[in-house]
Amino acid sequence: MEKLPGRVQIPAIIKTLMSQTKDYKLGIEKTLVSAYIQKKSKLRTDLHTHMNANLSPDCLIALGIKHQLRYPLYYIKKINLKLTKKQEERILEDRKLIEKQYENSELAGKYLTRKIDDNTFINFADLILNNIENAEENIAKIRSSLAILKDGQAVFTNLEKVYLYRYVFAKGVPSENKIEIKEEKINQIPETDIQKMVKQMIKDSEITSIYAHNSLRQDKLLWIAREYQKQGVEYVEITDTDLTKKDKGIEVLEEIHEIMPKIEEETNVRIRFLAGIRRIPLTILRDQKTSHNYLRENLDIIKTLAKSPYIVGSDFIGEEINDISELQPVITELVQYAVNEDEGFTIRIHAGENDSLRNNVGKSIDCIINSLKPGQKMPRFRLGHGLYSVDLASEEGKELIEKMRQTGGMIEFQLTSNVRLNNLSKLDNHPIKTYIRNGVKCLQGTDGCGFYGIDSIDEQLALLNLVGLTNEEFEKMKQAEEEVILHSKEYFVKKNKKFEEFLAGRNMKDALTILQEENLEQGKKNNVVLRINDDLEAEIVLQEKIKPLPLDKFPVIIAGGSFNAQEITTHVNKQMAQKLEKLIEELDETKVYLVIGHKMQGYEKIVLDTVKKLNKNFEIYAFVPKLIT
């Protein structure tokens, strides 16, 4: 039996599980695990990952040095980086100039400070190479900011914040204040891996190299492929939201077409792309305005860029806080596009990532089925995560499994990200074995190797050691990924031929720009409402009742289950109710105020009843959902 080399270890995913409970129950056999995989069982795809989550923190740092990217003063302050006296003096001088640009701004206080600091930069290469005395400490802090917590709990908000730190590098802008990057300076970088990568990047940029004129994005793709090559991965599908943006998408596609043949020649790794559609608008970027009709624009751009053989599908992404059936009109239009114009185009929906919307897995399949006209063939589709759904042992669950089998849909599992984002704390009922046993096609993804500090081998080891997949079950997963690999090869050849016919000798940018404008213009005439939603903005409906929280008192927050999933009921414990009464009795209403959830039941009701019983005069505030019915 041939094995891929490994060792005995406590995986980071286990450390995360330990951090989530005081009552850790996994035995030694699942805690201290053997880190090898039988070669015949090794999976060779990553079919669920994201563009700005692939590269390791060290690789992003190396790219920041090579491309001399701007690094904001805000992050220097935020993670407490150390500058030389000369660097500090210069950046403060630069800040004064930026401050003058905002002297008439409507912003004030911390918001104005943040705005100024966000737009005051140091050359990242300068920060590291001309500050070697602080490089080891600074690199350690920067590295920590670029990956999700490994040994502790995290939530979706942590994920969004890490993405912001990564955007400085992944979407970086070169500094105007370039420095000379000397080999002796590179040799002083205290981290060997970063040092090696910077040297290779400099070598790649030599005039005789085929990568001499690589853009930042092209370098990212090159290093993503090199990393996958080390992992034994041969086919990857990456979700990228830039592929749904007007003009930007065409620019990205030009870079992809130029670099990918070179990358495949060197690494034998084939990378293809899914156009990412946000299920809700992105709000974490303060200055990024999302068009009210962004879904319409996304669809029109996808229909433009999907002419390219490198665009193999679409992906509904983002935090799963809404019912997927709200997006039925969008799904319908994509399905009709796939069926009528782009046979083989894959529709992926993130569903079942957390337990708040367990019906989304089944509803996602129904949305696709309901999009078909009589006689039309089911398009290729995959579900990302699929962790939570109806009880698979129930009649409804059996119907779901049968529906997956009949439609040929596939489910992608990412164990590490589910544990890291606190969406999974118990492995006993993980559904993958049930799906495989019942003939549902299952695949593996990483959700972003660099983001979670893992690779595809780590992910497969987790399925082996923690979920207990057998060689026979891995063989079935290999059969599913082989189906994807074979389809991707045939699809690329067919689509590449059609793309050349579409271009008809024209420049790619010109041809796609014309088509983009035609599609956008046609889209303006389409009056179909793309989001079905009966929910109302709580901020508007409750505007008469909304008040700012007191600044002169201390909040006491009592979370009693208001935001539980629908099927979870809060049962009031008598001892806990007595403790709450004692707490409320001892609190001084002149110094504190109470904060509870919006449902006047469970412990929230106990709080209100106790305050009334004790005749206390507390200010009580309730957090409410953003949307209400």
Language model features with spans:
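Acidic/glycine-enriched connector segments
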Residues: 534-629
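Metal-cofactor-binding active-site regions of metalloenzymes
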Residues: 2-533
